[in-house]
Amino acid sequence: MSESELRQRQAEFTKELHGEGAESRTGLTALLSKNRNAQREAVSKYLRHWDGKTDKEAEDRRLEDYNEATHSYYNVVTDFYEYGWGSSFHFSRFYKGENFQAAMARHEQYLAYMAGIKKGDLVLDVGCGVGGPARTIARFTGCNIIGLNNNDYQIQKAKYYAKKYNLQDHMDFVKGDFMNMEFEPNSFDKVYAIEATCHAPKLEGVYGEIYKVLKPGGTFAVYEWVMTENYDENNEEHRKIAYEIELGDGIPKMFTVDVAKQALKNVGFEVEVSKDLADEDDEIPWYYPLTGEWKYVQSLSDIATFFRTSYFGRKFTNCMVSIMEKVGVAPQGSVEVTAALENAAVGLVEGGRKKLFTPMFLFVAKKPEDAK
């Protein structure tokens, strides 16, 4: 199937699954409005890539079909993400006295600062989600942003939110494969990615495309999901944690930090900053919203968010969705999605506690001025 045929098929399926006007619906309201047959198909498309096998053959199968796996993943989890997390699909560090939304915005602004994004810059957001970080960074810097995404549903939502918050003149969102970008070479002043390039089957592939479209002298800043130097691929417990993260987060293979850093160098980048922001011995761990530890909640406004994302909140949601699915209110497959997300949460927390995994390894890399 050609690239254009794949895009057309995905667009048609997205319309069938989510329906008209889906961009304005969020959370469980959006979930309950799905076409039931299409939802079942979407879940099957995603879960067929994860059958409990961690051998190389199963891994290679996921790597080969990364585009469809990622598209299917975000078709089925976007509503759950918005319900539990908001419109910025990433983790962050937390400081004492800082509420959840402030921490998320600061995390995004810090990346923009490290990338040197300034007013008037044309910036590419690789794997933009529903545009939460793009809106924050555009307001923070005054730059103009193009968001790249392979999921039609998320693009619809990102455009809807940009217009809703009167930012449509500062940003646009386009469909594309980050392993095969269609932008002109040397187009962007800066590029950033927030917990998105981990979906790539090969990091040199996505980093090479970023290098191509970035202007000489331009900067690429990324929060990368990687397994740390403590991770041992031959350790069964370590591999189980990595697999739980892969299954619940639509990732064909979790790479190590050394692989990521070398991939940047291999495509021509000069790596200026290489730092794990999760390894700062913070009093409040980055994974606290998933743990159920109320002692870390910083404000009254965080209570609802924390409950939805905590262990007990996730169990409540799973139970509620299970009942709705049984009585025919929620589409078939919804419970399987919540189960996959629960597996991911367990793996993320365990990986974080044992310092095997980080969702915020910061790389700041420069394309040489004399790059051709």
UniProtKB/Swiss-Prot annotation:
GO terms for biological process: cellular response to xenobiotic stimulus; ergosterol biosynthetic process; methylation; plasma membrane raft polarization. Gene3D superfamilies: Vaccinia Virus protein VP39 (3.40.50.150). Keywords: Lipid biosynthesis, Lipid metabolism, Methyltransferase, S-adenosyl-L-methionine, Steroid biosynthesis, Steroid metabolism, Sterol biosynthesis, Sterol metabolism, Transferase. Residues 1-23 have a biased composition (Basic and acidic residues). It catalyses: zymosterol + S-adenosyl-L-methionine = fecosterol + S-adenosyl-L-homocysteine + H(+). Pfam families: Methyltransf_11, Sterol_MT_C. Pathway: Steroid metabolism; ergosterol biosynthesis; ergosterol from zymosterol: step 1/5. It is an enzyme of class 2 (transferase). Residues 1-28 are annotated as: Disordered. InterPro entries: Erg6_SMT_methyltransf, Methyltransf_11, MeTrfase_SMT, SAM-dependent_MTases_sf, Sterol_MeTrfase_C. Disulfide bonds: none annotated. GO terms for cellular component: endoplasmic reticulum; lipid droplet. The keyword Methyltransferase applies. Its EC number is 2.1.1.41. GO terms for molecular function: identical protein binding; sterol 24-C-methyltransferase activity. PANTHER family: HYPOTHETICAL LOC100005854 (PTHR44068:SF1), ZGC:194242 (PTHR44068). This is Sterol 24-C-methyltransferase. It comes from Candida glabrata (strain ATCC 2001 / BCRC 20586 / JCM 3761 / NBRC 0622 / NRRL Y-65 / CBS 138) (Yeast). The lineage of its organism: Eukaryota, Fungi, Dikarya, Ascomycota, Saccharomycotina.
